[in-house]
Amino acid sequence: RLLDASVEIVAEVGWEALSMTAVSKRSGVPRQSIYKEVGTKADLGRAVVDREVGRFLALAGEELAAHPDLETGLAAAVRRVLEVGRANPVLQAVLRPGHDAGLLTLLTVDPDALLGQVTDAVMALLGDQASVAMVDTVVRLMISHLVQSTVPVEDAVMRISRVAAAFG
């Protein structure tokens, strides 16, 4: 309930306007309980990011499982993540012009908050099919296309697939 309420608030008014009081009212959980359960606003932000990352990883995992061929699986996973990401309310709120960079900082400054977590998870999904260097590169490119999309999804998928193929 807390994370759902937080996501709704972030999508409506942005991270900077989120307060524990607003989360308490929206979720029906007493404010003191939120502090005991979650901690600070930054801790809540990390929990929101972790949950959203988990959702993206689940989508990628579904595509990799449905497409056992590494090249096809990676392309399908990247496509699905980019398509869903472009409509994700948390990501859109964080990337909205004029936003407070607090939540974006969690995504970009702390490498373990996103990059390390995603790279490790994708490596676990792929096993020995791919090198750490290839997965790290694909994840970095995918995150870049999520955060600063300048081309259509299909173009991004094609570019990322070409880079992945270069790892052989």
Kindly give the residue locations of the regions a language model identified.
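Amphipathic alpha-helical packing segments from all-alpha helical-bundle domains
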Residues: 57, 89, 93, 101-136
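Short, hydrophobic secondary-structure boundary micro-motifs
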Residues: 19, 90-96, 154-155
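Phosphate/oxyanion-binding loops and surfaces in catalytic or ligand/nucleic-acid-binding neighborhoods
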Residues: 84-88, 145-148
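Short, basic, alpha-helical segments at the C-terminal edge of helix-turn-helix-like DNA-binding modules
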Residues: 50-58
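Amphipathic alpha-helical segments that line or abut small-molecule/effector binding pockets
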Residues: 4, 54, 71-86, 136, ...
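Helix-turn-helix
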Residues: 1, 5, 9-43, 47
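Hydrophobic alpha-helical connector segments
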Residues: 43, 47, 60-87
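C-terminal peripheral helix-coil segments that are non-catalytic and often amphipathic
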Residues: 116-132, 136, 141-168
